[in-house]
Structures are given as C-alpha cells and as structure tokens.
UniProtKB/Swiss-Prot annotation:
<dbReference type="GO" id="GO:0046872">
    <property type="term" value="F:metal ion binding"/>
</dbReference>
<comment type="subunit">
    <text>Interacts with host CCNT1. Associates with the P-TEFb complex composed at least of Tat, P-TEFb (CDK9 and CCNT1), TAR RNA, RNA Pol II. Recruits the HATs CREBBP, TAF1/TFIID, EP300, PCAF and GCN5L2. Interacts with host KAT5/Tip60; this interaction targets the latter to degradation. Interacts with the host deacetylase SIRT1. Interacts with host capping enzyme RNGTT; this interaction stimulates RNGTT. Binds to host KDR, and to the host integrins ITGAV/ITGB3 and ITGA5/ITGB1. Interacts with host KPNB1/importin beta-1 without previous binding to KPNA1/importin alpha-1. Interacts with EIF2AK2.</text>
</comment>
<dbReference type="GO" id="GO:0030430">
    <property type="term" value="C:host cell cytoplasm"/>
</dbReference>
<keyword id="KW-0805">Transcription regulation</keyword>
<feature type="modified residue" description="N6-acetyllysine; by host EP300 and GCN5L2">
    <location>
        <position position="51"/>
    </location>
</feature>
<feature type="compositionally biased region" description="Polar residues">
    <location>
        <begin position="60"/>
        <end position="77"/>
    </location>
</feature>
<dbReference type="GO" id="GO:1990970">
    <property type="term" value="F:trans-activation response element binding"/>
</dbReference>
<dbReference type="GO" id="GO:0019904">
    <property type="term" value="F:protein domain specific binding"/>
</dbReference>
<dbReference type="GO" id="GO:0004865">
    <property type="term" value="F:protein serine/threonine phosphatase inhibitor activity"/>
</dbReference>
<feature type="site" description="Essential for Tat translocation through the endosomal membrane">
    <location>
        <position position="11"/>
    </location>
</feature>
<keyword id="KW-1048">Host nucleus</keyword>
<dbReference type="GO" id="GO:0050434">
    <property type="term" value="P:positive regulation of viral transcription"/>
</dbReference>
<dbReference type="GO" id="GO:0032968">
    <property type="term" value="P:positive regulation of transcription elongation by RNA polymerase II"/>
</dbReference>
<keyword id="KW-0488">Methylation</keyword>
<feature type="region of interest" description="Transactivation">
    <location>
        <begin position="1"/>
        <end position="48"/>
    </location>
</feature>
<feature type="short sequence motif" description="Cell attachment site">
    <location>
        <begin position="78"/>
        <end position="80"/>
    </location>
</feature>
<keyword id="KW-0597">Phosphoprotein</keyword>
Amino acid sequence: MDPVDPNIEPWNHPGSQPKTACNRCHCKKCCYHCQVCFITKGLGISYGRKKRRQRRRPSQGGQTHQDPIPKQPSSQPRGDPTGPKE
C-alpha cells in the first residue's frame, strides 16, 4: 500500500478517480470503469427518480390510426353436422 498524504483530501488522492469520465456505454469494460459504473451499469441499481413515460394521446381530429376489427363469420359447430348417432 502506498503511504497516504494526510495533507491531501481523500477524493484527491492519486488513483481515487478514474482518468476518463463515465459514459453511457454498457460494455464489460465500461461496467467495471469505477464503483459508480459497476453499481449502476453492472448491477442495475439506480436510486434516481424513474422517468414516467407519457401516454400517446389520440389526435383531436377524432381519427384513430387503427382499422376497425372486421366481423368474423360465426364458426360452424364442430362434430357431425347430422347430429349424434344412436
């Protein structure tokens, strides 16, 4: 272990911070970039607020972009159409 200089704050010690900034990549190398990356990317733990997805509202023109479901013919009863044999 290297000796720790008591005159330097702990967050300024050499090796306390990675040389490159964190990014949004989730590859294996970036997941082990630093402790924060490992927790958020590697383990998937996030304590931030979850973004609520807005529902898409139908347009005010009254038209929906969906075709109506066509009526399907009633199905034929299964089995012998002449009825049960005795």
